[in-house]
Design a protein with these regions (language model features):
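Phosphate/nucleotide-binding beta-alpha loop and adjacent structural elements of enzyme active sites
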Residues: 1-202
Length: 202
């Protein structure tokens, strides 16, 4: 079973680990919206997974503004990175209201959902270099499920974990996840309440 250089969950189609990876890196790029996943480059050792990640297997609703509407309605380009499972993205809804734009621009699709355990099993993953998560408020749910799995399978704890920590998730939830990782042998590298938090395995 291979070592994966990276697993990136929630890629959209910009600033991805896939784009900066080299030809020897083995990775997974996970994105529930195929319109963005398909725009990413194809690399020999990187697998694209068209799914959402959560704490259960099945299906979930994802809310997003299609790229053609972003362009036609002259909406901010970063809307394409604001796709949210379970409910509309609060920043998108607020921005549309402030711009006097219709909330009907927000579409809803049903997408397949996998747990980290399923993702790891399906791809025969033995170890992970970097786990990067950017899922617009769903990061702590994914990480709590992942940590619980790794506590029984410690070799699958990633060397580096990078996840989004901003207003889309509660600070208490962020701190609880960080403390669980610290208790499992990580050290805090950087903590930014408006951007990302990074931890490394000691």
């Amino acid at each position: 079973m291979p070592h994966y250089t990276f697993i990136e969950i929630g890629t959209s189609d910009f600033e991805t680990l896939l784009e900066t990876s080299n030809d020897t890196d083995i990775g997974l790029s996970v994105e529930p919206l195929s319109v963005y996943l398909n725009k990413l480059p194809n690399k020999q050792n990187v697998t694209k997974v068209n799914a959402a990640i959560s704490d259960k297997n099945g299906e979930m609703s994802i809310y997003y503004v299609p790229p053609e509407i972003i362009l036609a309605a002259d909406l901010p380009w970063w809307f394409k990175g604001c796709n949210s499972v379970g409910h509309p993205h609060p920043t998108v809804s607020k921005c549309l209201s402030e711009m006097g734009k219709s909330q009907d621009f927000i579409m809803c699709d049903t997408v397949p959902v996998k747990t980290m355990e399923t993702l790891i099993f399906e791809n025969n993953i033995e170890s992970i270099g970097t786990l990067k998560i950017d899922t617009e408020g769903h990061d702590c749910i994914i990480l709590n499920n992942y940590i619980t799995y790794c506590e029984k399978n410690p070799a699958l704890f990633a060397k580096t974990i990078n996840f989004e920590t901003n207003v889309l998730s509660l600070v208490d939830d962020q701190e609880a996840v960080i403390n669980r990782l610290l208790n499992n042998g990580y050290k805090l590298v950087s903590r930014n309440v408006n951007e990302n938090t990074v931890l490394e395995k000691i």
